[in-house]
Amino acid sequence: ASSKEIAEAIGIDSATVRRDFSYFGELGRRGFGYNVKELMDFFADILNDTSITNVMLVGVGNMGRALLHYRFHERNKMKIVMAFEADDNPAVGTTDENIPIHAISEIKERISEANSQTAILTVPSVKAQEVTDILVEAGVKGILSFSPVNLSVPKDVVVQYVDLTSELQTLLYFMRKG
């Protein structure tokens, strides 16, 4: 990425990017720009941020399976370490992408093994609150929810919603506008 591209992405001018990066030595090459992966690795080392965050996936339907196949750890510092599904689901007891799929009723026992307080929720809307309650009771403190319902959680639990319909509508709006 060029210094101009980096500057636009973070809202500063390109001269500031070049000057600030120069304090750390030669991070880029004139005319070629910066290798973003190398920059991220470089700054992660400086900030001592080399740890990987373990994440659990709850719901192994179509969306869940797609996320199991996504290589989070290759692009950033996150890794899905285990998945959970309804107790009677045939996927329970199997693995996908070397990720074990457990019964949701086992989450309390498995959460310490996962070494995670973060879950991705991809369950049907009608089950979202029930499953969220189970996650919270098991000690989960952060939930990325793909279910289009507002979840009720205690104040110490953070929920981030991914609403694909809203994102698509926003995209279409800007396509028509531009």
Swiss-Prot record:
Pfam families (UniProt xref): CoA_binding (PF02629)
Chief location bin: cytoplasm
GO biological process: negative regulation of DNA-templated transcription; response to redox state
Location relative to the cell: Cytoplasm
Cellular component aspect of the GO annotation: cytoplasm
Signal peptide: none
UniProt entry keywords in alphabetical sequence: Cytoplasm, DNA-binding, NAD, Repressor, Transcription, Transcription regulation
Family: Belongs to the transcriptional regulatory Rex family.
Assembly and binders: Homodimer.
Protein name, as recorded: Redox-sensing transcriptional repressor Rex
Species per Swiss-Prot/TrEMBL record: Streptococcus suis
